[in-house]
């Protein structure tokens, strides 16, 4: 399969997911705190090459791939490559430099469920959302429990 076709398939999947994510958000009103980028600084977040294929292809088409390879080779921190902190002092606040091309993990975090060790669905979110949006977090858990997390 040609690379263009793979990129189109990933982008089509992301478009469908965005519809479902927006539906979940409209039911729960859950969202990341404005400017929070704490998860973008965690070195143990797993992401696959496939979920960043559209971004890599975008870099290639815009003659930025070589420059990015050099940047990656000289990188000294473990932040997500797309993350741009607002401050050198507190790297936990910032934003995605290319939101359209963010990975699947970035799209789903806080807006999806995963199975716990008992096989039960649980809201996949962070401590910051749990503490700052307690009522909404409870609502999100309720939506998941009642299967109100998928578009019909």
Which residues does each predicted region cover?
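Short loop/turn segments that flank or connect secondary-structure elements
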Residues: 1-38, 42, 46-152
């Amino acid at each position: 399969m040609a690379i263009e076709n793979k990129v189109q398939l990933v982008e089509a999947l992301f478009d469908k997911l965005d519809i479902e994510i927006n539906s979940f958000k409209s039911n729960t009103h859950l969202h990341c705190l404005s400017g929070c980028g704490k998860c973008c600084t965690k070195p143990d977040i797993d992401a696959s090459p496939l979920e960043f294929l559209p971004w890599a292809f975008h870099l290639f088409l815009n003659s930025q791939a070589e420059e990015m390879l050099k940047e990656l080779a000289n990188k000294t921190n473990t932040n997500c490559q797309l993350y741009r902190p607002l401050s050198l002092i507190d790297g936990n606040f910032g934003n995605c430099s290319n939101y359209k091309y963010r990975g699947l993990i970035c799209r789903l975090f806080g807006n999806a469920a995963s199975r716990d060790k008992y096989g039960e669905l649980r809201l996949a979110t962070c401590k910051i959302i749990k503490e700052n949006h307690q009522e909404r977090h409870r609502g999100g858990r309720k939506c998941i429990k009642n299967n109100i997390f998928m578009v019909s």
